[in-house]
């Protein structure tokens, strides 16, 4: 798979729905292209979020990151990484770091004072990645959800 120097980071576009869906499955969130198209379309239209992809000439899209800016009452605005995945065959070669840099640049321009990410307690490799890239572990919490 590709080396870091050959990885290009760019804004995602609707035509990226298929590889984004495949990569989402590697993250544990399987989706068909038909399911991904409206999700990606909505994300691309949102002014307070950005989606970037990592691609190589030989392998196409090998990763993506989705980040959003959150205006908060209790603290200064911050960005949150909503999702980040690199193709299993391309991990630990720098693409994730480049995607994170693109998201951080976008967040700064959006007026965010910091960035946070939530990661499943079982994803030790991801935790190491975020620590390596300057994040600090600051909270353990329980997550709740409700269908609407």
Q: Residue spans of the language-model regions?
A:
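Conserved active-site alpha-helix within GNAT-family acetyltransferase domains
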Residues: 97, 121-140
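Acetyl-CoA-dependent GNAT
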Residues: 11-18, 22-77, 87, 100-101, ...
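Active-site/acyl-donor-binding loops of N-acyltransferases
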Residues: 140-147
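Conserved G/P- and acidic residue-centered "switch" motifs that form tight phosphate/ATP-binding loops
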Residues: 94
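A short, internal acetyl-CoA/4′-phosphopantetheine-binding micro-motif in the GNAT/acyltransferase core
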Residues: 84-91
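Conserved N-terminal entry element of GNAT/NAT acetyltransferase domains
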Residues: 1-15
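Conserved GNAT acetyl-CoA-binding A-motif
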Residues: 100, 107-119
């Amino acid at each position: 798979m590709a080396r870091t120097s050959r990885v290009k980071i760019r804004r995602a576009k609707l035509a990226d729905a298929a590889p984004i869906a495949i990569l989402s499955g590697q993250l544990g969130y399987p989706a068909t292209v038909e399911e991904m198209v409206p999700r990606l379309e909505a994300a691309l239209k949102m002014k307070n979020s950005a989606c970037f992809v990592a691609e190589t000439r030989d392998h196409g899209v090998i990763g993506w990151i989705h980040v959003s800016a959150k205006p908060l009452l209790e603290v200064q605005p911050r960005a949150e990484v909503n999702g980040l995945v690199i193709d299993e065959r391309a991990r630990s070669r720098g693409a994730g770091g480049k995607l994170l840099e693109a998201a951080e640049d976008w967040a700064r321009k959006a007026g965010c004072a910091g960035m946070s990410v939530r990661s499943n307690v079982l994803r030790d490799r991801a935790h190491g990645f975020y620590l390596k890239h300057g994040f600090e572990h600051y909270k353990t919490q329980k997550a709740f959800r409700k269908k609407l």
